């Protein structure tokens, strides 16, 4: 059985989140959380929370053993972008895109 957890509109770009996500894909939940704990990227904390949420969903809603859970799917999709303007020389402006992402984790036993 597969159980899903999603976090939407994180304050990090999908490109940065995918660096953490690619490292833990296919690992056991406990092993993935341990790996993320020692990463220096601030996105690792967000990814870790989503994995813990998926494991808690499996344990509380479907009475699955959290020790047996494995990350079957994990991915980061692009979310909305905040568009801002930055002043430049000679009265011009250039756009700044503040990107965000949706993180989805699917665990299975």
UniProtKB/Swiss-Prot annotation:
GO terms for molecular function: rRNA binding; structural constituent of ribosome. The keyword Transport does not apply. InterPro entries: Ribosomal_uL22, Ribosomal_uL22_bac/chlpt-type, Ribosomal_uL22_bac/org-type, Ribosomal_uL22_sf. SUPFAM superfamilies: Ribosomal protein L22 (SSF54843). GO terms for cellular component: cytosolic large ribosomal subunit. Keywords: Ribonucleoprotein, Ribosomal protein, RNA-binding, rRNA-binding. One of its GO terms (biological process) is translation. Pfam families: Ribosomal_L22. This protein binds specifically to 23S rRNA; its binding is stimulated by other ribosomal proteins, e.g. L4, L17, and L20. It is important during the early stages of 50S assembly. It makes multiple contacts with different domains of the 23S rRNA in the assembled 50S subunit and ribosome. Part of the 50S ribosomal subunit. Belongs to the universal ribosomal protein uL22 family. This is Large ribosomal subunit protein uL22. It comes from Dehalococcoides mccartyi (strain ATCC BAA-2266 / KCTC 15142 / 195) (Dehalococcoides ethenogenes (strain 195)). The gene is rplV.
